[in-house]
């Protein structure tokens, strides 16, 4: 699931009964899902403090995987027992339109190849970053995404 506002709040009201396998909120959308301030989550994450983001994601009972995109700070993948943070080398941002969608596409592409969860997160960050470096809503090519260096740590 990759949505916001009212549809996201309706999903939250139906958890865990109607839990999807995967959601990909940004920090504001995670806040909407959990009833907390998403801007404060992103602010803390920007300072390298991920505990509140991880706790909020784990509070989404029934959802197996939560990818939280954090702009230039990268993204987190949170599961019941693990959490990872992946971040890109800096790029010149030309447009953020479609960057989250590209992140989700990169994650799912890696998943269909059978990659491990942490490598799916790396792919998500690479594709989202490549999209942000392109003008307008241009989708990156595989070679553009592959050119992005992504670091990863297990939290």
Give a label for each model feature.
Residues 5-7, 29, 72:
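Active-site-proximal loop/turn and secondary-structure-junction residues that shape catalytic pockets
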Residues 1-3, 24-25, 67-69:
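General beta-strand structural signal in soluble alpha/beta enzymes
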Residues 9, 13, 17, 37-155:
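Conserved phosphate-binding/catalytic region of the ribokinase-like
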Residues 28-35:
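Active-site rim beta-loop-alpha module in soluble metabolic enzymes
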Residues 17-28:
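Non-cysteine beta-strand/loop elements that form the S-adenosyl-L-methionine
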Residues 1-2, 8-10:
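Loop-centered beta-sheet repeat module
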């Amino acid at each position: 699931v990759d949505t916001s506002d009212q549809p996201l709040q309706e999903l939250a009201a139906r958890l865990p009964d109607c839990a999807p396998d995967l959601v990909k909120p940004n920090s504001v959308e995670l806040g909407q899902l959990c009833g907390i301030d998403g801007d404060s989550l992103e602010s803390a994450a920007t300072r390298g403090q991920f505990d509140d983001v991880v706790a909020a994601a784990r509070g989404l009972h029934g959802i197996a995987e939560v990818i939280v995109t954090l702009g230039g700070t990268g993204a987190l993948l949170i599961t019941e027992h693990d959490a990872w943070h992946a971040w890109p080398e800096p790029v010149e941002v030309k447009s953020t339109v479609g960057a989250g969608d590209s992140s989700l596409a990169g994650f799912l592409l890696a998943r269909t190849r059978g990659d491990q969860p942490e490598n799916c997160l790396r792919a998500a960050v690479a594709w989202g970053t490549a999209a942000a470096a392109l003008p307008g809503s241009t989708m990156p090519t595989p070679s553009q995404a592959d050119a992005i260096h992504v670091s990863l740590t297990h939290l």
